[in-house]
Amino acid sequence: MKVLLLEDVKNLGKAGEVCEVKDGYGNNFLIANKKAKLATNEVINKYKAEVKKKAETEALEKAQKLQMAETLQTVTLTIHKKVGANGSLFGAITKEEITERLKEHHANLNLDKKDIELKHPIKSTGIYEIEVKLGSGIVGVFKIDVVAE
């Protein structure tokens, strides 16, 4: 019997492959445990269409993330904070504060605080480059200008 593997099966094949197996193994193990489907033309064509649609969706999402990374490069946030006599801030600028400011000034950039990478806490005035992990290995960078009030 021919089956279309829905997931990787050790010593048999990878997901998406059509394999020839014995009837008992196919029916009692692979199909029963939803690791494979009976390989008819309809099932194979449907699987290929799903894979193609998934690839198109991933390509579209990656293009959107690249566009967001380009947009982020043009962003410079200015944050006003109280400063002590030695030039250091009272407290540090947090990821949460950065995401709130981004949402205020750039509503189209929808980022979560866990996406922001701070190499070290921001505790003094100056210009800092902030990295944002957008997924799919894409990293965006924008600048923050910390100014004394």
Swiss-Prot record:
Keyword rRNA-binding (UniProt): yes
GO biological process, one term: translation
A GO CC term assigned to this protein in UniProt: ribosome
GO molecular function, one term: structural constituent of ribosome
Function in brief: Binds to the 23S rRNA.
Similarity annotation: Belongs to the bacterial ribosomal protein bL9 family.
PANTHER family noted in UniProt: 50S RIBOSOMAL PROTEIN L9
Protein name: Large ribosomal subunit protein bL9
Taxonomic source organism: Helicobacter acinonychis (strain Sheeba)
